[in-house]
Amino acid sequence: MKKLSLLFGLILSGLCHFNLLQAQHISQENEFEALMQKIRQDFAQNPDITQGLEKYNVQDGSFTDVDYASIQRTNWPPLVHINRISDFVFAYTNPKNRYYQNEDLYNKIEKGLEYWHERNPWCHNWWYNQIAEPQALGVLLIQMRTGKKQLPHELENKLLERIKKDGGNPAKWTGANRTDIALHWIYRACLSKDAETLEFALENVYNPVIYTTKEGFQHDNSNFQHGQQLYI
């Protein structure tokens, strides 16, 4: 439900904002920030990070209970790392959280992201590499922009470059997969203030929301993904 809310919000407001930008030459920075603020509102949370802190390895930024070498195709263990760092980010940036603006937590976030980039876990299920991981990274980077202390530009840029390199191309996919990949293209475009990438991403987010006889919305309002299925 959260993803659908974000999707249609981005389609409607994003396209309107972007067209206005092109037509009236309004500040691009304001337009990108407006989209990022909508994303933050959709994912806002006040997490309990007690368990994550207990498992955090201060020596290298990893988590002691995560198998980073795992390549299993479902419930991919390394994704726990990104989910916990994401919780750290939301705790650090939420005024209602006890760890709000906590310097030690900031250091854990930075070291945890450095570890992830250097370790570069890989899954045999493409979905984790091209959708789950880059989406989660995009959201946490957007949220971290609101922090008292910002991530080093070098760290943020190399994470964005990794997302670009490994995150896939939405135009090569159909249906929900196309939309899911396009979403993290939107996140990356906003963070890098790349108008061309944003336009491409918005086109691909909107594209599956049409009737088709292939994967996607059918004329009877059903939806096909991964092939056709018989009604039960």
Question: PLM ranges: what are they?
Answer:
Residues 1-25:
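Bacterial Sec-dependent N-terminal signal peptides
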Residues 9-10, 35, 55, 108:
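Alpha-helical protein-protein interaction elements
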Residues 11-15, 39, 134:
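Residue-level detector of solvent-exposed, low-hydrophobicity positions
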Residues 14, 19, 46-47, 147:
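Short, flexible coil/linker elements and helix-boundary hinge sites characteristic
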Residues 23-75:
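Mature N-terminal, pre-catalytic/accessory segment of carbohydrate-active enzymes
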Residues 53-232:
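Aromatic-lined, polymer-binding surfaces characteristic
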